[in-house]
Amino acid sequence: MRENSWLSYTEEDDKNVEVLAQEYKEFLSKCKTERECTQYFIKEAESHGYQDLNKLIAQGNRLKAGDKVYGVGMGKTIALFQIGKQPLTEGMNILCAHIDSPRLDLKQNPLYEDTELSFMDTHYYGGIKKYQWVALPLALHGVVAKKDGTVVNVNIGEDPADPVVYVTDLLIHLAGKQMEKKGSVVVEGENLDILVGSRPLAGEEKDAVKANILRLLKEKYQMEEEDFLSAEIEVVPAGPARDCGLDRSMIAGYGHDDRVCAYPSFAAMMEAGHVDRTSCCLLVDKEEIGSVGATGMQSMFFENTVAEILALMGQDSNLAVRRALARSRMLSSDVSAAYDPAYAEAFEKKNCAYFGKGMVINKYTGARGKSGSNDANAEYLARLRRIFDDNKVAFQTAELGKVDYGGGGTIAYIAALYGMEVVDSGVAVLSMHAPWEVTS
């Protein structure tokens, strides 16, 4: 077993860890959706000299070694590049992570009233234990796109003066039959509706509580009920990330999966000096539901962005794109399950991740015989071992859990379709996919 890194830290290391942890907690507390993450990264990148790719294309500017550029996909995914001295066709060093997290999404017609209580209907996003999302203070984050083209940002429940919303649960005194159900159905997905009001609007004879909610939304966001049809509003745990443990050695918060990988990947790009080989940080959406859609890893966004960059370097050919991608090397950063002694039966101790033992390398993920995994090449792993050891980087190797106990997938296999070297790597997490997760 690897040494606990806390034991080898110097006083300066401890200070650096504390600084990074504080910055990360601020990010995690503010950025709870893929849109919010992307906007944060754009602002920070521009302050570090990165330029918008679309503006460079419009101006016909050429790219050269040392230039920094970013491309954005529909406000939900972002790719950042620092051009190296070597030709881009020799490949890139890529850090990739996802910025979506499990949550509840409002349906397109969400608002209703029942017995003078007003609710909003939701559809859960990603793999969740549905019973974990009841009886918690929740917040609303998202956007409302109106017919006139304006887009209104929604954020309710994060300011201490804000109200929160809530999914009700059945009191234990009446829950005899409920407690006999399997965990997967003890709370049904269709019952994950958020309670948003109970005060009727004076003068309204029908659905007066709902009418009052609509009045409040119109006052604050100038929106009508029909505007829900073109809204993307996510229901997430309310409140900031917190230090966890009496020794403050851990962080509890929403969205560690996968922002605990996305944030340091981005930070590494911002701190990088001049590079010989082009560096890239790719932060994508929709991983939790299969990397689908125009902003997921299965889309053409990344390939198209690389093609545009090559064109600005005078290499406007399909072959150049293929060579640049095939000769790249990627760390596909996603969280790994940390060993939990309370559920020891799910883990194989020799091949699992532990807090304090360094970043986690997963040669493969998947389930039922590695199905759906990338399975990194031994030669690539040897190369990474040498780099990590030469630079005194603490790392460990792990599988998700015991064979045939379950499994999971990442974006690694999708990137590997280009022929590049890819390995899963990331951070160990306790209570993965819960509303509040814990990392070291």
Q: Where are these predicted regions, by residue range?
A:
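N-terminal hydrophobic/helix-forming segments and targeting peptides
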Residues: 1-440
